[in-house]
């Protein structure tokens, strides 16, 4: 009797088509490029709503936001539709072991178990990841750069002296760099730790292959802030980065299509002066534009490498012979 195939379900947060196989000659993504040669690639996809919570709720249920009623970053999906069926829940109901790690649902839009009905094994959240004592967890969940970590510690101490209860919010309101790097192992950053945990899960799953599995692995980069080990930044020459062709509003472009980049401006950094011009657009110096683009590509290559590690484990355990691999993006930027 043929066993149902396993499913490896990989989510990437905010990835645009900065992949070699999608025609980006600047991108260094050898793992996804190689995989794409054996895969079916979907080139005409459209997000239901370009906001994290609504997009993920829609994708994971196959329902439009008009149905899920998740249109923001606080509505709980099952508060509105308690019996809504998710992709992993469907597999669970049909004999699969379902488990996951990282960011699959937006945590603000599901319960604190990352949607309990979806998983037959407790979902592994970011605060359950393991980091070496050599470097510890990334500050604010993002940063391993020593200077940034020291600044975060200083601000936390300052908040404590002022009697502030939410220390991390105090730090983020005053200091949250949009990019960062450090000469540390991949596993020092959240996404490296996610890949490492996924590999352990695959190794455990390979010990008993009588039950098919649905393993969801959710990576958090290349969403802001653009943080990755230095070696991925070193893959790219900042001087070769091309800026966006259009730096102003298009002729007769509708105002609704433009905004003042509120999320970008929430990343407080003393070296960047966020200026809103007369067109209500964010003006950034060219060097900072290049820093951001550089960081985005570095993070894309970082995630590509983590996917490579997972695929290698899939192969070394023999699970690759009966596993369907899905790589998708929650939603993206143009």
Regions found by a protein language model. Name each.
Residues 1-334:
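Formylglycine-dependent sulfatase
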